[in-house]
Regions:
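Extracellular leucine-rich repeat
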Residues: 1-582
Length: 582
């Protein structure tokens, strides 16, 4: 059970405040200016695991009551005025997994203060935003942590020396957008040689005189994040980093991909170089030494290549994830990804693709499951564009246009027998042939939103059932009664923001809609557009009277009366005429 009392102007927490809340496991008191907390303030919950006292004005940990906190796993004390991390005597820390001191006034960390955490295992300790000036030698001696965060601290040598003989899975030493970049020298990392750590984040620092010796103490690392560290190149000759599995080089200043000197990291399985501050030259064979690479993110780099991508991705036989989205035009030949036959996820969104062969550039990707081709300016008339993708499950074609603004019976989707999720949003479609999706028998999710489709296009889905169908923001006015059976077979439908007709001509659909409201999402935005008197009325509120009214019955009787009189006079006239001509 979760209780959030954020910014409730609470000043006092009295004895046994929560005494009847036995199931409570989380208490959030963030933003309350606390003046007093009784010793038994947290009595009651049988298993209180999470306590948030962020921005409560605490300046001393003695303020926190110790009773009934034996099960506590996370304690959040950020944005207070705490200057010492010395806990009250007998404070239960044995089950703590998260201890957050970020944005306090902690300048010194003493060995005595750290001893209270000896019983905690796999602890994540957060000192971000504290201007730590010194750590007493031995304060972290022989201690093991899940993660340590010292973000925003300028003098990293103080931190790394203070962490000697400690162990951490993750060490976060980056800075933030509102702080000055700190110049890092090789000498600052000397302390790293005296501790055990697997992952380090150094984002937004600045390397001075970077050389291969800068990384002398990085040999044990499995993950290294150098985001926004103003790097123009990584030095050649870096040795001993055979353990590194993940390298993040986002938002730097490389001119060419080869400037990362990938051969220095032969065991990499995950490489991210996105958001480069300059146009990145893809090069040729820059990553060929990374034969174990499984994940590669090169998005948002303005990469341009007239012949992509076998030369650039040479010798990457184990690559499973490739992101080339938000780049400049790429020319794709037949089997453009032959070097990466095990690709499972390929993202080319917002990258203009020039397909230079009639055959599919993806035809060798027989295990590809996710393909994002949104806003790629594709030639969708090429029926062979997606040939060979026998295991494709998820396809995004959002923002691509089709010939004559319609999807015909014969189209590029026909080879995709395994497809489950299809997005055709914002494709400027007017219509869909009723047999256009006949080969897509495994579909579970279709997004046709932001087009100009009418109700007749629903007939293309008649062979499907149990799907999520998004038809929001189209031109649907009325849905023929014969198509209601198709809609009734689907799980979830979105018809919001369509110009729906709320007259008797659409009575069958409106009645069915109100009876099946549980199938629909966006019902608050599913409204009438016609007649003008009902414009903006929610469809589920519409009440139509489409039978004959009392006034109608009166006029009908009058009409029939006049017909009867006319008929009588006609008969009399005929009889008289016949008699006169005997």
């Amino acid at each position: 059970m979760f209780l959030d009392l954020t910014r409730c102007q609470i000043n006092w927490v009295h004895e046994d405040t929560f005494q009847y809340q036995h199931q409570l496991n989380t208490i959030v008191l963030t933003g309350n200016p606390l003046i007093f907390m009784a010793e038994t303030a947290f009595n009651g919950p049988k298993s209180l695991k999470h306590l948030s006292l962020i921005q409560t004005g605490i300046s001393n940990l003695e303020f926190i009551p110790v009773y009934n906190l034996e099960q506590l796993e996370s304690l959040h004390l950020g944005s207070n005025h705490i200057s010492s991390i010395k806990f009250p005597e007998n404070f239960p820390t044995q089950n703590l997994k998260v201890l957050d001191f970020q944005n306090n006034a902690i300048y010194y960390i003493l060995s005595e203060d750290m001893n209270a955490l000896d019983k905690a295992t796999n602890l994540s300790l957060n000192f971000n935003g504290n201007d730590i000036k010194a750590i007493e030698p031995g304060a972290f001696h022989s201690k093991s942590f899940q993660s340590l965060k010292f973000g925003g601290i300028l003098n990293l040598s103080v931190i790394l020396k203070g962490l000697q003989n400690s162990t951490a899975q993750s060490l976060w030493l980056g800075t933030f957008e509102d702080s000055d970049d700190q110049d890092l020298t090789p000498a600052m990392f000397e302390g790293l040689c005296e501790m055990s750590v697997e992952s380090i984040n150094l984002q937004k620092h600045h390397f001075s005189n970077i050389s291969s010796t800068t990384f002398r103490c990085f040999t044990q690392l499995k993950e290294l994040d150098l985001t926004a560290t103003h790097l123009k190149a990584l030095p050649s000759g870096i040795e001993g980093m055979n353990a590194l599995k993940k390298l993040v080089l986002n938002v730097n200043n490389f001119d060419q991909l080869c400037q990362i000197n990938a051969a220095s990291f032969p065991s990499l399985t995950d490489l991210s170089i996105k958001g480069n501050m300059k146009t990145l030259d893809f090069g040729a064979g820059c990553l060929e030494k990374l034969e174990n690479l499984q994940k590669l993110d090169l998005s948002h780099n303005d990469i341009e290549a007239s012949d992509c991508c076998n030369l650039q991705l040479k010798n990457l036989p184990h690559l499973q994830y490739l992101n080339l989205s938000y780049n400049e035009p790429l020319g794709l030949q037949s089997q453009a990804f032959k070097e990466c036959p095990l690709l499972e996820h390929l993202d080319l969104a917002f990258t203009h693709l020039h397909i230079k062969a009639p055959q599919s550039p993806f035809q060798n990707l027989r295990v590809l499951q996710v393909l994002n081709l949104s806003h790629c300016l594709l030639d969708t008339s090429n029926q062979h564009l997606l040939a060979g993708l026998v295991d494709l499950r998820h396809l995004n074609l959002q923002g691509n246009h089709f010939q004559d603004r319609r999807i015909s019976k014969t189209n590029l989707l026909q080879p995709l027998n395994s497809l489950e999720v299809l997005s055709l949003s914002s494709c400027d479609l007017l219509s869909i042939d009723k047999q256009a999706f006949q080969s897509l028998g495994k579909m579970s999710h279709i997004d046709l939103s932001y087009n100009s489709l009418t109700g007749d296009s629903i007939d293309a889905l008649s062979h499907l059932q149990g799907i999520y169908l998004n038809l929001a923001v189209n031109s649907i006015q009325a849905i023929p009664p014969l198509l209601l059976h198709t809609l009734s077979r689907q799980n979830t439908i979105n018809l919001s923001h369509n110009p729906l007709d709320c007259t008797c001509l659409n009575m069958h659909f409106i009645t069915w809609y109100k009876e099946n409201l549980q199938k629909f999402e966006g019902v608050e935005e599913t409204m009438c557009a016609n007649p003008p008197s009902l414009m903006g009325v929610k469809l589920y509120d519409v009440e139509l009277s489409c039978g004959i009214t009392a006034v109608g019955i009166f006029f009908l009787i009058v009409f029939l009366f006049f017909i009867a009189i006319l008929l009588i006079f006609s008969v009399k006239f005929l009889l008289r005429w016949k008699y006169e001509h005997i």
